[in-house]
Amino acid sequence: MIRALALALLAPLLVAAKPAPDLARDFARASTPQAVAALAERGQLVKIYLFPLEVGGPEDPMNVAWVTPAALRQAEAVTDKIIALLEQGKVDSLDVQPEYKGDSRVPSRIRYIATHKTGPAKLDRVVEVW
């Protein structure tokens, strides 16, 4: 009886310990604004400006994407590096290239290429989203 009670008490913990579902599958099916909004409500996606506002990106719906919180942190680190290079005069141009899989509205990766008119790319980083 004690063992049955212990199992009954532990059951919710065991269920809660199940691994998270494969998010890539969810993002592949995130092909509508409603699907993206549902993932954002659950905290699986957060808003990002593809061309960072900090370096002159427009606060415009066409500049918005939805990424994982981890990808947002990576993108912020890239933005910080770009800002430092801009302040040092080492770059004067930024190209942001989001890549999508299928009909998903969530980019699978975002590539940032910062260059200077006098030479090759000074920064070429890819943020993997999913």
Residues of each region from the PLM?
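Domain-level detector of nuclease and nuclease-like folds
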Residues: 24-130
